[in-house]
From Swiss-Prot:
This is Elongation factor Ts, chloroplastic. Keywords: Chloroplast, Elongation factor, Plastid, Protein biosynthesis. CDD domains: UBA_EF-Ts (cd14275). Gene3D superfamilies: 1.10.286.20, DNA helicase RuvA subunit, C-terminal domain (1.10.8.10), Elongation factor Ts, dimerisation domain (3.30.479.20). It holds the Pfam family EF_TS. It is found in: Plastid, Chloroplast. PANTHER family: ELONGATION FACTOR TS, ELONGATION FACTOR TS, MITOCHONDRIAL. GO terms for cellular component: chloroplast; mitochondrion.
Length: 202
C-alpha cells in the first residue's frame, strides 16, 4: 500500500533541512512517511554531494565579524565559497555567524583543522601523555595505543571542524558545513579565524 505524504509534512521537512520540496517528498516516500528516517536520508545524501564538491576552488566568500554578548569577545572569520552569488546568500551568512558563535563558545578551539596543528604541538602532547603515572606499568604495545587515543582526543579539542555543532550536538561542525554545501551547491571552506578578548595582548 502506497504511503500518502501530505504537503504539511513535506514543508516541515523542507524548513528543517533546506532541501527542495520535491527532494523532501521523495525522501519521505522512500522512507514510507517516516520523518526521522527521511531527515537522516537527506543528511547522508547531502554529505555525499558535499564530498563531490570538496575539491573545487573557493576564491570568493567573506570576512565575517562577530561580537559576543557583552562586547568583550570578538571573532573575525574568513570563510570561502566558489561564487560571489553564494557569498551573498542568507544561508552562507548564517553559516558564518553560527561558526563564529561556535568559536566564541569554546576558548579551547585554536585551529580550523587537524592539519593546522604544528608538529611541535603534537610532540609535546604525546610527551605529556606518555609521562602520565597510570601508564608507567602498562605493556609497551598497550601503552602506545592508549597514548595515541589520548593524543587524538586532546588534539581534537583544539580543532574547529571536529567539534560537536553547538546547535545540534548530534553532528560535527564539518557535517554542518556539508549540509549547507548540499543546500547551496558549492564547495565551502573555513579558511582561518582570529579571536579577540578584551584586555588580552598577544
Amino acid at each position: 500500500m502506497k504511503t500518502e505524504i501530505d504537503a504539511k509534512t513535506v514543508k516541515k521537512l523542507r524548513d528543517e533541512t533546506g532541501a527542495g520540496m520535491m527532494t523532501c517528498k521523495q525522501a519521505l516516500t522512500e522512507n514510507h512517511g517516516d520523518y526521522d528516517k527521511a531527515i537522516e536520508s537527506l543528511r547522508l545524501k547531502g554529505m555525499a554531494t558535499a564530498d563531490k564538491k570538496s575539491s573545487r576552488n573557493t576564491n570568493e566568500g567573506l570576512i565575517y565579524s562577530y561580537i559576543h554578548t557583552g562586547s568583550k569577545l570578538g571573532i573575525l572569520l574568513e570563510i570561502n565559497c566558489e561564487t560571489d552569488f553564494v557569498a551573498r546568500r542568507e544561508e552562507f551568512t548564517d553559516l558564518a555567524k553560527n561558526i563564529s558563535m561556535q568559536i566564541a563558545s569554546n576558548p579551547e578551539i585554536q585551529v580550523v583543522s587537524l592539519d593546522d596543528i604544528s608538529d611541535l604541538t603534537k610532540i609535546e602532547v604525546r610527551k605529556f601523555e606518555n609521562a602520565k603515572d597510570d601508564l608507567q606499568n602498562k605493556p609497551e604495545e598497550i601503552k602506545n595505543k592508549i597514548v595515541e587515543g589520548r593524543v587524538e582526543k586532546s588534539l581534537k579539542k583544539q580543532v574547529l571542524l571536529e567539534q560537536e555543532y553547538i546547535r545540534d550536538p548530534n553532528i560535527t561542525v564539518t557535517e554542518y558545513i556539508k549540509q549547507v554545501v548540499s543546500i547551496l551547491g558549492e564547495n565551502i571552506r573555513v579558511q582561518r579565524f582570529t579571536r579577540y578578548v578584551l584586555g588580552e595582548i598577544d
